[in-house]
Amino acid sequence: MFPQRLDSTVAYAIAKAMIDGFNRHYRLFRTESARAKHRFETADWHGQQRAQRERIEFYDLRVREASIRLEREFKAGEQPMDVWHQVKLHYIGLLVNHHQPELAETFFNSVTTKILHRSYFQNDFIFVRPAVSTEYIENQEPTAQPTYRAYYPTQGNMHETLVKLVEDFGLCREFEDLRRDAGYVAEAMAARLGDVKLRANFQIQVLSGLFFRNKGAYVVGKIINGFGEIPFALPILHRQPAPGQVLPADGKGISSQSDAGKLVIDAALFGEDDLLILFSFARAYFMVDMGIPSAFVQFLRSMMPRMPRAEIYNALGLAKQGKTLFYRDFLHHLRHSTDKFRIAPGIKGMVMLVFDLPSFPYVFKVIKDYYPPQKDTTREQIKGKYLLVKQHDRVGRMADTQEYSEVAFPRERFSDELIAEIEKFAPSQLEISDRDGDGQMEVIIKHVYIERRMIPLNIYLQEAFDFGVAEPAARDQIERAVVEYGNAIKDMVAANIFPGDMLWKNFGITRHGKVVFYDYDEIEYITDCKFRKVPTPRNEEDEMSGEVWYSVGPKDVFPETFGPFLLGNDAVREVFMKHHADLLDAAFWQRHQARIQAGHVYDVFPYDQQKRFAVMHGPARAG
């Protein structure tokens, strides 16, 4: 029950200290995000990667700071519960005119649950649902930018409007030929619109912040005409060197203004599917300067209605808010469904126990207590690998995960087979009890990773085999899968990631047909591996031996040995050798390793090469 009077002398001080802690967090988060513009302008790619990694750690650091302050100044953990009731009410009052209330509520939950005992994690003490609306939040300060800008082109001035639209972002680096690129965009927009009549409300709306990731900046907006809306994005890149030209860089890998090239609009992406791939859960988080993040999320959701708000917050780098919203969505789904959790279909992993709820598009992964001898690893090492992926550029090829502790599920929703599986392989991670004292038995998982469910690649291929490889549809499916598999590995190589275990079962197919890796317990940095050719046998005995007769170090990798594990099917082998035979050659890996060690940052495009203007409009510019 909430108190009728706010009579505690310390409750307001605790609430104020907590909101001060959040404001400090978001100020630092926003400052780091805004600096991405300068790093893009100066081609500081290594700085951009470093900032993306470090920003992920900001939230936990600020939560820890706030918790320490509350304990030191107010002995917060010793305060009675009626004081904590009042703290929450004061905190709600402080959020009335706040520009990030939903993030501040989540921050309150994080700090409170760090201080209070779990038995107090009830609706009265934390924000189970939002208390403050995020609708129509606006910054009324005269110097504040609106969330988005609107432009009203006509048939006659579309080209000039697009030039102004890009110039309004104020990039401090010259374009190679902005008028030419704006012409390409205008042509692409005209083709997309077709012969429709331009209505009275015809306009282009663009979010006022550029979206920065890796070596690109993205204009994100939508075209509105009558009752129709078309989402779009314009990738802006530094001009690439001509084939064979290598741009010199200093010791930090930063190219000079003249060397790195001028800016170009590289493509025009249209429609929800293109945007969903751009904002995919398998890519690194964007850096974008947002005063009112909920307004950005609302705008993006209007463009991608199939994308959960939780994943949009994740894509914007606000992973803790994404985690909060995901859990709320999960509880809502549980309340409105009746199916049971089960052991996930597919080949069981040696390190992870995986289960799912058929009606829910995610899987739950628990680290096992015991591993077979060939898996020389520990729980902490596995958690370290998942953290590495979280902080790394996932280049659209590694699934993002959400990490949770002490997650409670209704016992009646778990199949007995699943309970037996957890008791056998991960007993330390399982508790079955009435923890809340409400008479309902719960399954409590101590530590779990949650990620998007995909079709395992081995199952996808088996479906084609079962259909019959002589059938054109089956052969097309095999070709798409194998080509995408090789592309996925090469994209990961470009990001300095060696997957370790390259078996088909460790990759999945997304709804857009992309192949994504999701088994991280053996990943390594490419630069930490030693890629070798298998030595020439010394004699006939070596050649005929079924055992490895040569020395193998802990980080040694022999690419030519991948074939027997991957290419047992003739149809698969034919496609693989046609498109990706280089993956079986140690020289391929050594070459990429050397370039990464030399400071080169590869380009990985979140769209098809055929959509690039340099491809569509010929060799007029290097691209």
From Swiss-Prot:
The organism of origin for this protein: Polaromonas naphthalenivorans (strain CJ2)
Pfam families: AceK_kinase, AceK_regulatory
Location (main, coarse): cytoplasm
Keyword list, A-Z: ATP-binding, Cytoplasm, Glyoxylate bypass, Hydrolase, Kinase, Nucleotide-binding, Protein phosphatase, Serine/threonine-protein kinase, Transferase, Tricarboxylic acid cycle
Source domain of life: Bacteria
Molecular function per GO: [isocitrate dehydrogenase (NADP+)] kinase activity; ATP binding; phosphoprotein phosphatase activity; protein serine/threonine kinase activity
Subcellular location: Cytoplasm
Catalytic reaction annotation: L-seryl-[isocitrate dehydrogenase] + ATP = O-phospho-L-seryl-[isocitrate dehydrogenase] + ADP + H(+)
Function in brief: Bifunctional enzyme which can phosphorylate or dephosphorylate isocitrate dehydrogenase (IDH) on a specific serine residue. This is a regulatory mechanism which enables bacteria to bypass the Krebs cycle via the glyoxylate shunt in response to the source of carbon. When bacteria are grown on glucose, IDH is fully active and unphosphorylated, but when grown on acetate or ethanol, the activity of IDH declines drastically concomitant with its phosphorylation.
One Gene Ontology CC term in the entry: cytoplasm
Name of this chain's protein: Isocitrate dehydrogenase kinase/phosphatase
Record family assignment: Belongs to the AceK family.
Any single GO BP term: glyoxylate cycle
Record's keyword annotation contains Signal: no
Gene giving rise to this polypeptide: aceK
Catalytic residue positions: 400
Binding site for ATP: 344-350, 365
